[in-house]
Amino acid sequence: MTAQPYPVSEIVAAQRPHRRDAARNYDALLAAAREAFAENGAEASLEDIARRAGVGIATLYRNFPTRRHLFESVYADEVNELCRVAQDVAALEPWDALTSWLRRFVDYTVTKRAIREALNNESDVFLACRDSMYQAGGPLFERAQKAAEARTDISFDDLLRMVSGISSTYFPEETQRDRVLGVALDGVRTAR
């Protein structure tokens, strides 16, 4: 699978400042926001995010004029990474590539639940992220189907909705979530 630009890749590239010092601050803010949102949810303090990044609140607002801009930037950056993972796992056997990516997708969606819920599902950034995930994962699923390793009577949309349902469910232990995901994937795999 050759590297291809996804809609989200263009958004991430357009948002990131070109000056080295500004890019460093931007990256530090994204990392701090990821951490703060993971710990405190969507209501994490913007002042705390700026402090964690080692910048002033004015620098945060210069990069992200609103909380929504910050949510969208963190979300887009993470989806861009998820798309990169699809390219990385593409060299694996078809079923292994698909399941590796889907497991990463579940890990990603579980940790980004607060951000995802805070986003407007009709925003251009959200739609570009969704389209990018489909463009990244869809070929992995098609490859598994062509190799007769995945059922052909379901679509990638069906599969992603099922896996999204699992990732949006609260599990007291990660091992239980992994078991449930394994059972679901067994239902997608063709008989061997």
Label each PLM-derived region with a short phrase.
Residues 1-13, 100, 139-150, 165, ...:
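C-terminal peripheral helix-coil segments that are non-catalytic and often amphipathic
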Residues 1-43, 47-52, 69:
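Basic, helix-initiating cap at the start of DNA-binding domains
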Residues 28, 48, 96-104, 158-162, ...:
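Amphipathic alpha-helical interaction segments
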Residues 37, 45-46, 57, 67, ...:
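Amphipathic alpha-helical segments enriched in hydrophobic/aromatic and basic residues
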Residues 41-42, 62, 151:
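Helix-turn-helix/winged-helix DNA-binding modules
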Residues 54-64:
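Short hydrophobic/aromatic patch on the recognition helix
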Residues 73, 83-110, 122-126, 132-134:
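Hydrophobic alpha-helical connector segments
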Residues 91-119, 146-153, 171-175:
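Helical hydrophobic small-molecule/effector-binding pocket
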